[in-house]
Design a protein with these regions (language model features):
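Aromatic- and Gly/Pro-enriched helix-to-coil junctions and flexible linker segments
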Residues: 22-168, 187, 194, 238-244
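Bacterial N-terminal signal peptides that target proteins for export
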Residues: 1-9
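His-enriched metal-coordination microenvironments in redox/metal-binding proteins
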Residues: 133-419, 426-429, 442-446, 450-452
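Short, charged low-complexity linker/loop segments at the C-terminal edge of domains
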Residues: 115-119, 276-280, 425-437
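Extended, polar beta-sheet/loop recognition surfaces of beta-rich domains
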Residues: 65-78, 259, 398-403, 427, ...
C-alpha cells in the first residue's frame, strides 16, 4: 500500500512537472520566434554588413552577445533611433521607427529568459534587405527619376569643419512636382557630412541667378521627405541647384572612419510626378527654415550657453493665410537635447501640443512627416510656437566639453536654433474644405461606418 502511494505520488509529481514544463515552453520567447522577428524587422536594416550600425545582427550568433544591451536600448527607447515622445501631440507619422510597447515587452521577456534560440529546426528566415547603398524609397517608388550629384570633395582624416558652396545644373527642362526626395552621402561620407542643404536658383530676364527657394535639407541620419499627393512642391525648369555642404573631418558616431575620404560625393535623388501634375492639384508646398528666437544674423552674439549650464530658445511664426504643417524637423548641434512644436490660438487663448522630442540627438535628424489626414491645419493668424532646449553639462552624453562657453555658429562645436517645416499654403476655401472632410471622417469613425 505504501509503495502504491509512493508510486502515485511520484506519478503526480512527474505529471505536474511535465505540465509546468509545457506551460514554460508555451511562455518561452525565442529568437526563432517573436524576438528574432522584432530584431529583423526593426534593427537589421542598420545592423548588417555594410550598414551604419557598429555591430551586425543578421544571425542569432551575432545577436546573442548583445542581447542585454539590446534590452536596455529598446527599453529606454534609444533604439531604434527615432526620438519622438509618446502621448504628446500627433502620433500618426509616416516612416515612424518607434517600437510598439508589445514589441519592447517581447525583447525584454526574451532577454530575461536567457535569450534562447528556440527550436533549431524552425529557424528564422533571413531578412530580405536592399543594398545599404540603395535609395530609401526604392521599394515603394522605384529608382529616382533624377539624381543630382555634388562636385567631388576630398575630406581629410582630421581637422576643423569644412564647407563647400557650389552650383550644378538641375537637369530639369520642364516644371515638375516633387513626389519624394532623399539626400544621400555616398559610402563612408555618411559619418562626415554633417549637413547638405540645397536651394534652387533661377535666371532672371537679365541672365542673373536669383534664389527661388529650398530644394531640400539633409542632416546626419535623415531618411528623406515624402510630399503629400494633394499638393505640388515645384522644381522649376532650367534651374540651378546651389549646394551648401558642411563636413566634419574624422566623422561623428560609432562608424566614423577617421581616415581621409577621396572624391566624396553627395547625391540628391528625386522622385517626380508626371508632367502636368501641377494642373491636377490646387495648392503648393514649400520647405523653409524657421528661426527660433534669433535671426541668423544675430545668432552668433545672442545665442549663448554658459559652461556647465543650460539654455532654452523660443520662436513664434504666423501666416496671413491658412496653412497645413506637413512635417517638422528641429535642428541643433551637440548641446541640443529637446525640441517641441505647438500652435497658439489668439481667439481662444489655448495652446495645442503638436510634437515633442525629449531625447533629441545630433546624430539622427528626422523629418517627422505627419499623415496627411491628421497633419495640423492652422487658421489665419494662429501662431506656431517652436522651442528648443540645450544642456552644456556632463549629464549630456553628446557634450564634448562642458567647461566651454558655447555660442551660435556654423561649426559642429557651435550651436544652432531653428526648425525645418514643410508647409502647404491654403486659401480659406481650401482650409474649410479640409476641416469639413476631417469632421465627416471623425463622425464616420465614431459611428462605426467605414470611410469611403
Amino acid at each position: 500500500m505504501k509503495n502504491t502511494i509512493r508510486l502515485l505520488g511520484s506519478t503526480a509529481a512527474l505529471l505536474c512537472s511535465m505540465l509546468v514544463h509545457a506551460q514554460n515552453d508555451e511562455d518561452l520567447v525565442t529568437y526563432n520566434g517573436e524576438a528574432g522577428r522584432v530584431i529583423n524587422e526593426n534593427c537589421v536594416v542598420c545592423h548588417r554588413e555594410g550598414g551604419i550600425g557598429p555591430m551586425q545582427f543578421e544571425t542569432y550568433d551575432q545577436v546573442r552577445p548583445w542581447a542585454p544591451l539590446i534590452q536596455i536600448m529598446v527599453t529606454n527607447r534609444e533604439m531604434p533611433p527615432y526620438a519622438y515622445d509618446h502621448g504628446i501631440g500627433i502620433q500618426n507619422l509616416q516612416g515612424d521607427w518607434r517600437l510598439e510597447q508589445e514589441q519592447i515587452d517581447t525583447i525584454v521577456a526574451w532577454v530575461n529568459q536567457g535569450a534562447p534560440l528556440g527550436n533549431p529546426d524552425n529557424f528564422l528566415p533571413p531578412p530580405q534587405l536592399n543594398d545599404p547603398s540603395e535609395w530609401n524609397f526604392v521599394d515603394e517608388l522605384g529608382e529616382p527619376n533624377l539624381v543630382i550629384p555634388s562636385i567631388p570633395i576630398d575630406i581629410p582624416a582630421n581637422g576643423n569643419d569644412l564647407w563647400s558652396t557650389h552650383y550644378v545644373p538641375s537637369g530639369v527642362t520642364q516644371n515638375r512636382c516633387i513626389r519624394a526626395i532623399q539626400v544621400k552621402p555616398k559610402g563612408e561620407a555618411k559619418s562626415v557630412v554633417h549637413h547638405a542643404n540645397s536651394s534652387i536658383e533661377i535666371y532672371d530676364e537679365e541672365g542673373q541667378l536669383g534664389r527661388y527657394g529650398m530644394l531640400t535639407e539633409y542632416a546626419m541620419g535623415k531618411w528623406g521627405e515624402l510630399v503629400p499627393k494633394d499638393v505640388c512642391r515645384t522644381f522649376p525648369q532650367n534651374s540651378v541647384v546651389r549646394w551648401g555642404i558642411h563636413m566634419y573631418p574624422g566623422g561623428l558616431g560609432t562608424t566614423a572612419p577617421g581616415t581621409i575620404i577621396k572624391d566624396n560625393v553627395v547625391e540628391i535623388g528625386l522622385w517626380l510626378h508626371p508632367k502636368g501634375y501641377e494642373k491636377e492639384v490646387a495648392y503648393t508646398q514649400d520647405l523653409k527654415q524657421y528661426s527660433i528666437q534669433f535671426q541668423r544674423s544675430e545668432r552668433e552674439t545672442k545665442l549663448v550657453i554658459p559652461p556647465n549650464g543650460y539654455q532654452m530658445t523660443q520662436g513664434f511664426h504666423s501666416f496671413d493665410h491658412p496653412v497645413r504643417i506637413d512635417s517638422f524637423q528641429p535642428h541643433g548641434h551637440l548641446r541640443m537635447v529637446a525640441a517641441s512644436l505647438e500652435i497658439f490660438s489668439p481667439k481662444t487663448g489655448r495652446t495645442e501640443a503638436i510634437s515633442q522630442i525629449s531625447n533629441w540627438s545630433a546624430t539622427w535628424h528626422h523629418s517627422h512627416i505627419y499623415e496627411p489626414d491628421i497633419a495640423p491645419l492652422v487658421p489665419t493668424g494662429a501662431v506656431l510656437v517652436l522651442k528648443q532646449w540645450y544642456d552644456n553639462t556632463a549629464a549630456n552624453p553628446n557634450n564634448p566639453d562642458p567647461d566651454q562657453w558655447v555660442f551660435g555658429g556654423n561649426r559642429t562645436a557651435d550651436e544652432m536654433t531653428h526648425a525645418w517645416l514643410a508647409i502647404t499654403h491654403l486659401d480659406e476655401a481650401g482650409y474649410q474644405k479640409q476641416l469639413k472632410k476631417r469632421k465627416e471622417q471623425e463622425f464616420l469613425s465614431l459611428s462605426g461606418t467605414a470611410s469611403p
